Each structure stands twice: as C-alpha cells, then as structure tokens.
Amino acid sequence: MLILDGSRTEAEDTACLDLARRLTEGGHQVQHERLRDRKLGYCQGCFGCWVEHPGRCKTDDGHAEIGRAFMAADVAVLYGPVTFGGYSAALEKVLDRFLGLIMPFFQKYGDITRHTARHARHPRLVVVGVTDDPHGTDARTFRKLAMRNAVNLHAPRVDLRFIDRAPTESARADLARCVIEPEAVAA
C-alpha cells in the first residue's frame, strides 16, 4: 500500500500517521510518502512525458520513484487537506506529474472522455480529504475532482472519505477499515 501524504504540517498528518501505523500493525506493507519532506518540482507542461520520453518526466527530482511505487501498489491512498475544493499543493504537484502514467490518446468512458491507459493494471484509490465541513461547497468540488482523477488514472475502484481535522478514534478506525476492506465501511 502506498500513502501519498499531502499534509502541510505535522499537526495535519496525525490521522495519516495513525492510518499507516494501523495498516502496518495489521500486517500490510505500507510505504508512507510525506510529500512536504520531498523537494519535488511542479509539472512544466512540456508534455515530454508523452512525446519525447514516454512515461518519464524530464525533471529528475525523485518523482519517478513515487510514480513507480504508485503503479506497483494494490492500494494508493491520497491523503491531505481539502484546499479550496482541491488537493494540497504537495499532493497536486505529484498528481499533475502522473500525466506520464497515461497515454496522450483519448477514449470514451461512459459519458465522458478520458486518456487511454499506459499500463495494464492500476491501483485502487482511497482519497481522503481532511475537512471540518464534509458537506460544504469545497467538499462537493473536491469529490468531483477526486472522482475525475480516478477515472483518468484508470483506478479499478475509488473510495472517497472525508475526515475531520481532529478525528475521533472511531473515525480513524473506520478509515483504516476502508483501506483494508472497503465493502465493510459505509461511505
């Protein structure tokens, strides 16, 4: 399992650290990437990952190993604060640079158009938005964004959870169960 932790501060990632601990104690192999500790660049929008060197970003800053870990994972958790209806800057940088994980071609998927897959298998996504208002405008926008990202990343399944900035023990346990056995926890 891969956890991409987009928390901006230590205070924000206590529930994420708790999730990693619970999964590890449950016997799961977990790679927890605290993105704020990495010096990752922004996507330059050059499309080199599509046309010059397919699947690889020209910027060599450690992002490639995150992409490999993402594709190797059975489950990838995207964790971070809901920021104006989007991801934190650290998590957005990583997701933007996942462009090389898909092809520059399009296909119809239901009633939408998406990029074709570059790889045969993709991880299940668990998207965790940290917010104290899971029913507000920002959360509704975040939900749409996360679901569209899941479609473009060809996730075979996506589970979206909102968690308070100071979650209860029960909420933390439910989050871990959602990652391990998603059918057991109602949305």
Regions found by a protein language model. Give the residues of each.
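N-terminal beta1-alpha1-beta2 submodule of the flavodoxin-like/Rossmannoid cofactor-binding fold
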Residues: 1-80, 84-103, 169-187
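Short, intrinsically disordered/low-complexity patches at protein termini
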Residues: 90, 101-102, 110-112, 161
